[in-house]
Amino acid sequence: MKKILQGILTSTIVMFTAACDDELKPDNFSGQLTETVTAKPVNDFLNSIGINTAIYTRGETLDKTIEGVKDGGFRWVRAGYEGTAFFNNGVFQKLHDETGVLFSYGMGSGGTDTARVMADARKLHEMGAFLAFESLNEPNNWGIIWDGEAGGGENSWLPVAKFQRDFYARVKSDPVMSQYPMFGISTIGAENDNVGLQYLTIPEGAGTLMPDGTQYYDYGNCHNYAFGGDNDVLRDNQTWLASSPGNDNPFDGPYGNFVKTWAKGFLGYDEETVVNMPRVSTETGVTIHTGVDEDMQGRMFLNIYLSQFKRGWAYTSIYILRDRIDEGGNQTYGFYAPGYVARKAAHYIHNFTTILADDRDKSTTAGTLTYSIPKKPETVHHLLLQKTTGKYYLIIWGERYTGGTNNISISFDQNMSSVKVYDPTIGTEAISTHNNTGSISLEMGVDIAILEIEK
């Protein structure tokens, strides 16, 4: 776990009758006012939504974890063997059976027991519940011993690199488990020596301490928390920027891990490659602190999932389901407070995933929708999804965290037979319905509008 940010704004989505004349910028429309957009399956987005939880240890209970995971609609859980003496097959089986979640499974902090991870992962595979392997958690904070050598932290990272090489090779040599991807080491931007962990596979001529061609992982992994500490001040587009693969990301993002490492400046991929590289976030989030109350935290959580998916992250796991009770400092990261008291974030994610719920066993034939958002503010973003029913879901969200609102209009190339507008911070029922309409107007500050569209 780690970082923080602040802000204040809680405006409700309000329907307006006319578009505004604010000075705005188009977003991802290639400079065009109107574009035909291919929808992504709703299930692809929902499958990306993950959560950190200790499940049944560290003061958490299985029944409450099941309740929280089911209510939140989370599709995967980040797990590992850390803190457990053995794999509790019954716990994982029950959590999977009652919620349908899959599990990433890994070493945790300071662990190197590859045999244990392989055996546990195989059991998850056998129950149809395995998603991916995960490697070391933040070896800058929790070093390891590999082949008798200390690595990570202030030591050389060569033992870390050798461990990862060996772990990856072991997974990929297994005739059954090799089908699953490896999520990489987190916070590798901290490496003290240039062992090449900034690459998935070290390319020819990289000049690293490990040889060219060394294979490490299938997905880059960041812990890109959307804040930098309890004293930070919220900025506009904060969660959008935290999801950026570029050097405009002020947090622990892909640029500082895979392009130019933030600790020692070791060079890795070029920026264009990182934009398109497979990547995940096994930890992100924000605490409650000055400027970020329960409402703002809940809105930011939804914006994190949306921004991450829109900007190319395959999987995102927010830290954490329920606040830690065995660690010091500000631990208000959770959807639930100690005692499993639901915060507003828990209600918002429930409403959000309920509105978007779809049959995960069916496939979606990608359709297109032609629309525009004239004079769109740079703090307004959009994502087009489609359910297996054929209905489109255009999600519009605002990141004007410093205050104020903008009036915007979404215009379609033809009249839509029905457009229903949902606000997940209010509930699961539509707040307005529009028939035979060619445009919808909204007021956006730090708001989320889900438009259910039937042509």
Regions picked out by a protein language model, each given a short descriptive name:
Residues 14-39:
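Bacterial Sec-dependent N-terminal signal peptides
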Residues 47-53, 77-79, 101-107, 131-135, ...:
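Hydrophobic faces of well-ordered beta-strands that scaffold small-molecule active sites
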Residues 55-71, 114-124, 194-210, 297-305:
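Short, acidic/polar
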Residues 63-67, 74-131, 151-186:
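Aromatic-lined substrate-binding rim segments of carbohydrate-active enzymes
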Residues 156-304, 311:
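Noncatalytic carbohydrate-binding groove/subsite architecture in carbohydrate-active enzymes
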Residues 370-415:
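Carbohydrate-binding surface patches
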Residues 433-455:
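C-terminal beta-strand-rich structural cap/linker in extracellular carbohydrate-active enzymes
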